[in-house]
Amino acid sequence: MSRYRGPRFKKIRRLGALPGLTNKRPKAEKDLINQSRFVKKSQYRIRLEEKQKLRFHYGLTERQLLKYIRIAGKAKGSTGQVLLQLLEMRLDNILFRLGMALTIPAARQLVNHRHVLVNGRIVDIPSYRCKPLDIITAKDKQQSRTLIQNSLNSSPHAKIPNHLTLDLFQYKGIVNQIINSKWVGLKINEFLIVEYYSRQIKT
């Protein structure tokens, strides 16, 4: 299944706020109410919607998400929490959380177009897994700095999570540590997602 490129507002009306996908918000609380609100949802439907929230927020294909699920399943600790850590430490997500890009798709474009350095080297892979002490900067070109400055100026200025530090004047972000799952900026039940994929993890 490919990455979603359809109407974004349609998704947030059904699933709720997805800040990684779009910075738009429903105009009223009723916009978050699914038309099937009064129909009792099956457990499968509930797990499916949680999985879709995660996939659309981080901009992943079905295959990519399943790959992360399998990696998390082999790691020590809670599979759901490890999954969130893996996704949050992606370079495109780090740029988004720093405010250097307004959405994760926008961050992915910055990386693909080689506007971003990690530890002084160009990285053009959005899924690059950042690690503690990584330093993320704009390439020393006017176009790169302008793109990131525009995003920083337009950013809603949400609190930078504790595992990151932002230097506005140097267009620089620092990864202080692996993210604690409590700092994930998305209302999600990761355990339902693990349950959704439980059979596929075992295959």
UniProtKB/Swiss-Prot annotation:
For this protein, the record's CDD domains field holds: S4 (cd00165)
- Give the main localization category: plastid
> GO molecular function terms here?
rRNA binding; structural constituent of ribosome
Q: Which Gene Ontology cellular component terms are annotated?
A: plastid; small ribosomal subunit
Query: Where is this protein localized, as stated in its record?
Result: Plastid
Q: Does the keyword Ribosomal protein apply?
A: yes
Q: Which InterPro entries match?
A: Ribosomal_uS4, Ribosomal_uS4_bac-type, Ribosomal_uS4_CS, Ribosomal_uS4_N, S4_RNA-bd, S4_RNA-bd_sf
Q: Which example biological process does GO assign this protein?
A: ribosomal small subunit biogenesis
Q: Which PROSITE patterns match?
A: RIBOSOMAL_S4 (PS00632), S4 (PS50889)
Q: Name any one Pfam family assigned in the record.
A: Ribosomal_S4
Per UniProt, the keywords (alphabetical) are: Plastid, Ribonucleoprotein, Ribosomal protein, RNA-binding, rRNA-binding
Q: Which residues form the S4 RNA-binding domain?
A: 89-152
**What is stated as this protein's family in its record?**
Belongs to the universal ribosomal protein uS4 family.
HAMAP family of this UniProt entry? Ribosomal_uS4_B
What PANTHER family does UniProt report for this protein, alphabetically? 30S 40S RIBOSOMAL PROTEIN, SMALL RIBOSOMAL SUBUNIT PROTEIN US4M
* Quaternary state and interactors: Part of the 30S ribosomal subunit. Contacts protein S5. The interaction surface between S4 and S5 is involved in control of translational fidelity.
Per the entry, what this protein does is: One of the primary rRNA binding proteins, it binds directly to 16S rRNA where it nucleates assembly of the body of the 30S subunit. With S5 and S12 plays an important role in translational accuracy.
Which protein is depicted?
Small ribosomal subunit protein uS4c
The organism's taxonomic lineage, starting at the top: Eukaryota, Viridiplantae, Streptophyta, Embryophyta, Tracheophyta
Per UniProt, what is the name of the gene that codes for the protein in this document? Answer: rps4
